[in-house]
């Protein structure tokens, strides 16, 4: 299973970005940031791996924020593998 998490330094920016994506028709969830990522406020926005281009466009429109990065999360044999993309 693979998915993306979008990490921010601020919980309020995480919630604002989640609301922004939802208002623009993209299914998203607020999740705990995987500890393996070692970044952020503890919460991230989870989106489908197939939503990368939409997510990047949304980030460019979202404006000034505490955005840290987009991470690909792969779950293999119960372990999470995190890569910055």
Label every PLM stretch briefly:
Residues 2-5, 9-11, 17-18, 22, ...:
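Amphipathic, hydrophobic secondary-structure cores in small proteins
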């Amino acid at each position: 299973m693979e998915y993306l998490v979008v990490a921010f330094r601020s919980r309020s920016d995480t919630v604002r970005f989640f609301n922004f994506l939802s208002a623009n028709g993209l299914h998203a969830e607020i999740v705990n940031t995987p500890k393996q990522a070692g970044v952020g406020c503890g919460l991230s926005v989870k989106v489908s791996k197939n939503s990368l281009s939409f997510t990047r466009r949304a980030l460019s429109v979202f404006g000034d924020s505490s955005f840290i990065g987009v991470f690909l999360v792969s779950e293999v044999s119960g372990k999470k593998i995190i890569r910055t993309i």
